[in-house]
Amino acid sequence: MRKVAIYGKGGIGKSTTTQNTVAALAEMGKKVMVVGCDPKADSTRLLLGGLQQKTVLDTLREEGEEVELEDIIKGGYKNTRCTESGGPEPGVGCAGRGIITSVNLLEQLGAYDDEWELDYVFYDVLGDVVCGGFAMPIRDGKAEEIYIVCSGEMMAMYAANNICKGILKYADAGGVRLGGLICNSRQVENEKAMIEELARKIGTQMIHFVPRDNFVQRAEINRKTVIDYDPTHKQADEYRALAQKINDNKMFVIPKPLEIEELESLLIEFGIAN
């Protein structure tokens, strides 16, 4: 079972990218579980046809200790297994701790057991590595390969670099490695070349460039992944290509994060700061 975590700046399109990629892997015949690690609990909605599933933390609050695996995992597109960790009530508690509680409970209830014959588990993780809880999939070896969703926008690249610092910090302890950058295009000038260069400097690869297409939003409005909504659309082939590249990937590295000056000079070199 391959344990994958998807990180990236808030609003970059992590959940959309994760679900569309998982749909492509499921279409290939892979058995995949998605663990949403975001208090918004929107990491599995498209795989579940728009269903906002009840989160692990909400279930624990209502049911107490008497929780069964089927209470917190729902079957999604092509037999994907979907669960959402959820978060505390707004203004109370720590969302990072919620992830730790949820993943530990999933382990106790046997969600990762051999009987499920999982090929992949995907963790879709909120925003930047802002606190220890959100770093948990990296820190505790829950995830072994990380993909960072970014774009040619400055803050997305800044966040990607910060996430690399988190991977570097825990690489020895948890055995986690960076599998590559996924460029979710924002149609920034020289975007593809810039992210390829950022990846090279960090010591990794841009595993795929996902072009911007409003069809993704159309599929989302219809509560589906692109592959589910229209498997013949060209954007569906982009996610298939990304899924295939992840499936075939052999390049797993300990990243070399850039100093802020290096990052800024990269932006200047490609004309963003001009």
UniProtKB/Swiss-Prot annotation:
Gene3D superfamilies in the cross-refs: P-loop containing nucleotide triphosphate hydrolases
Binding site for ATP: G8, K9, G10, G11, I12, G13, K14, S15
A GO MF label: ATP binding
PROSITE patterns: NIFH_FRXC_1, NIFH_FRXC_2, NIFH_FRXC_3
Keyword Nucleotide-binding: yes
PTM comment, free text: The reversible ADP-ribosylation of Arg-97 inactivates the nitrogenase reductase and regulates nitrogenase activity.
One Pfam family named in its UniProt record: Fer4_NifH
UniProt keyword Oxidoreductase present: yes
Family as reported in the entry's similarity comment: Belongs to the NifH/BchL/ChlL family.
HAMAP family for the chain: NifH (MF_00533)
Subunit (UniProt): Homodimer.
Name of protein: Nitrogenase iron protein
Organism: Chlorobium phaeovibrioides (strain DSM 265 / 1930) (Prosthecochloris vibrioformis (strain DSM 265))
Gene: nifH
